[in-house]
Amino acid sequence: MGYVVGQDIGYSNLKIAFGTSDGEMTTVIRPAGAAPKEHFGSRFDGKKQDDFLHVNVNGQEFVAGVSTDRAEMWERSLHADYAKTDSYKALFHAGLLLTGQKEIDLLVTGLPVSQFQDEALREDLRKRFTGEHKVTAKRTVNVKDVMVVAQPIGGLLDYVNLVDDGPEEDRITDEHRILVVDPGFYSLDWVLVSNGQLQRQSSGTSLKASSVLLE
């Protein structure tokens, strides 16, 4: 029985699911805002900011898991190198902190399809997420193993798990051809699964996503 964590670090939201591999999963969704502590002001009434998650990023204190408009003089990341930014690392640490665990057997995370198809980018993220992480001054979390998937696959796996004990006609087999579309804030991603395999030539990423529509 291992402890498993799923993290989807998006441009708008941080979504995590965690629990033992043979038990129920807890799910949490937080906004994907993250910036150094000094970019956040205090409340007008003097009360504590109780929705702040304080995490360590390379020795600097960050606030993570808040709305992107809460940080002053700090722009949100909207580019392909998002996964290499300090804000992304802060959200990763926030996700680990929210699990309340000190050791995780398997962490599953995703990349946009175009980045997932780059083996070097997949391996770089896997290596960075594996091992010990000093998420706060007092807490270190050890991640034993990491699996990187194409982001839309998470929705498909959730559906497979949901219908596993349901009617036979609802279950997915290798005979099915499945298109999964994941409309995000920065990118629109899609995957085609056929014969139980991700069809790389029919899967991809478009940057004409929600952020473009809102401009």
Regions found by a protein language model. Give the residues of each.
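Hydrophobic, aromatic-enriched interface-forming segments
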Residues: R177-S194
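Nucleotide/phosphate-binding catalytic cleft detector across ATP-hydrolyzing
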Residues: M1-I178, Q197-S210, E215
